[in-house]
Regions:
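Non-catalytic beta-sheet/beta-sandwich ligand-binding modules that flank or precede catalytic cores
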Residues: 1-406
Length: 406
């Protein structure tokens, strides 16, 4: 027998040469002191025979020994041929490599994480190639390398972007062996989670997008998933007003109250969500912008109010002209303008509500040197802001006809 270690499915062959022609010998084989499981087979004739046995997976590790008996063709028994247990010619080495450890140093992976996969065997292995022997879903495993002769192997795993899967295991195949050729078992890591899906804003809306004095609007932000580290003061900007602290209404919906700034007229505003928030895994969020909203909290005012004639006598019908700072809505001269000692006709506008004119007819038989036309606050601008008051300069009414005293 040649001197080398053998493993399961190897064949051990024993050459037997007789001093004369012999019949088929009968041999028994043992390894490590225990009979080997399989029965030997024989070939040959005359003085030259071969006894062969297939090593079984369960054969005991240790030196292979044998004992053979034989007879010549006449039936005379020859001296038995055998070996002792410590000859060391051939040794069975049936110990299979096993996996001692197979794990990640991080099992909750987010964007930017690159955990290390460590695989430790019970002994040095050969024929191991991580690209062929290890599969890790939802990511890419770099080529694994060993710094201790093939016992421990490490490699970097990069999770796939835009992926959300909390059920994953790396699997080891069985194509590797130890130095003697014994195959190893398969193995799986513990579960790991891949969460590289960035949270985003599904919607950001104002309940009122045309804001006037006294209005408040509810800002509602709906995220794609539960978020962490979200603070409205830091993460949301809404110009031309102030946003109160936002509160969580459900797992993904936040609301806050927006109050427009006074004396502001700006028809181009959007609320913006920054990227400083994260999801529960730590992935940074994406920004978002609301639709446009209009802030008009500037109250309309009376720019001027004047009569074309302030010394009014019988037969005079001066024109009253009122100019507002912006187009006035809901303005009705009968309700909103008072001019004593006379009657004001219905006022009309030819420029969409900014300038209004009407005719004043003084009362008859009246003498009054102290009069003003006054504008009330019943009108608004187009946004609905209540207007301010106005007052004309003084005018005189003298419609008393002179008489002959004597």
């Amino acid at each position: 027998m040649a001197s080398e270690p053998v493993i399961a499915k190897d064949t051990v062959s024993l050459a037997i040469t007789g001093s004369e022609a012999i019949q088929q010998p009968v041999c028994t084989f043992a390894s490590g002191g225990a009979n080997m499981a399989n029965s030997p087979s024989y070939s040959g004739s005359g003085t030259s025979w071969t006894a062969s046995i297939l090593v079984a997976d369960g054969d005991t590790n240790g030196d292979v020994t044998f004992s053979c008996t034989f007879e010549d063709v006449a039936g005379n028994a020859g001296a038995a041929a055998d070996t002792t247990a410590d000859t060391g010619d051939i040794e069975v080495e049936n110990t299979h490599p096993t996996v001692s450890a197979f794990s990640f140093n991080d099992v909750a992976m987010k964007t930017g994480d690159t955990p290390t996969l460590t695989l430790t065997f019970s002994e040095a292995v050969v024929g191991f190639a991580s690209g062929d022997d290890v599969t890790c879903p939802n990511g890419a495993l770099a080529t694994m390398s060993s710094a201790n002769g093939g016992v421990t192997w490490t490699g970097t795993f990069t999770p796939t972007a835009n992926t959300e899967d909390d059920t994953n295991v790396c699997s080891l195949g069985t194509s590797y062996t130890d130095a003697n050729g014994n195959s190893g078992p398969s193995s799986d890591t513990a579960n790991y989670a891949v969460e590289t899906q960035a949270p985003s804003v599904n919607s950001i809306t104002m309940s009122d997008t045309a804001l006037k004095t006294g209005d408040t609007s509810t800002l509602t932000i709906v995220f794609s998933e539960t978020v962490a580290g979200f603070a409205s003061a830091d993460d949301v900007t809404c110009p031309s007003g102030s946003l109160g602290a936002m509160s969580l209404q459900s797992g993904t919906t936040w609301t806050g109250t927006f109050t427009p700034t006074g004396n502001t007229d700006d028809d181009s505003n959007t609320c913006t969500v920054a990227t400083s928030y994260t999801d529960s895994a730590g992935n940074a969020g994406t920004g978002a912008t609301s639709a446009n909203y209009d802030v008009d909290t500037v109250a309309p005012t009376v720019s001027s109010i004047s009569l074309s004639d302030t010394d009014i006598i019988s037969g005079d019908t001066p024109t009253l002209t009122i100019e507002f700072s912006t187009a006035a809505s809901g303005f009705a001269s009968a309700d909103d303008v008072t001019c004593p000692n006379g009657a004001l006709s219905t006022m009309t506008s030819s420029d969409s509500g900014v300038t209004w004119t009407g005719t004043f007819t003084p009362s008859g038989s009246t003498t009054d040197t102290s009069n003003t036309c006054d504008v009330g606050t019943g009108y608004t601008d187009d946004a609905g802001n209540t207007g301010g008051t106005g007052q004309s300069a003084n005018y005189k009414v003298d419609t008393v006809a002179p008489t002959v005293s004597s």
